[in-house]
């Protein structure tokens, strides 16, 4: 069974996307009523994957072809900062913004908001496989 830490896409533009996630008490990444650091990191990674998949789905296909979205691999995580762990019942809004893209590699800046506060942020390098393109 997959570990899901995004419930939907709330915004999308050419360079940025935002997801929503509701922290539930029985989730694998919840301990003592708090959503863990590892859950926040996975939420950022899944938001990046959601962004890439949705962005790819919006491209105009070539007639007669059904291309598959690229598969992403995390190459590096930099400056992962967590200032607070959200409680069960919280709504998290995670925004990823592509700051640089070249030859199948993206650098994204990510932030996770709970209420009005940014509770986590990082920079992530993602490599997109072109094998299935």
Please annotate each region the language model reported.
Residues 120-122:
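A structural microfeature
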Residues 113, 125-129:
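Short beta-strand edge segments in extracellular beta-sheet folds
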Residues 118, 132-133:
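Extended, hydrophobic alpha-helical segments
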């Amino acid at each position: 069974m997959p570990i899901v830490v995004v419930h939907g896409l709330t915004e999308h533009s050419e360079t940025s996307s935002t997801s929503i996630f509701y922290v539930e008490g029985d989730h694998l990444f919840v301990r003592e009523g708090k959503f863990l650091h590892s859950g926040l990191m996975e939420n950022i990674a899944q938001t990046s994957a959601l962004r890439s998949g949705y962005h790819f789905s919006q491209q105009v296909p070539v007639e007669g072809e059904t291309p598959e979205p690229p598969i992403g691999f995390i190459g590096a995580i930099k400056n992962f900062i967590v200032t607070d762990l959200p409680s069960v019942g919280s709504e998290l809004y995670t925004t990823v913004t592509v700051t640089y893209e070249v030859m199948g590699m993206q650098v994204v800046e990510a932030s996770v908001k709970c209420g009005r506060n940014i509770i986590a942020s990082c920079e992530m390098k993602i490599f997109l496989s072109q094998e299935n393109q």
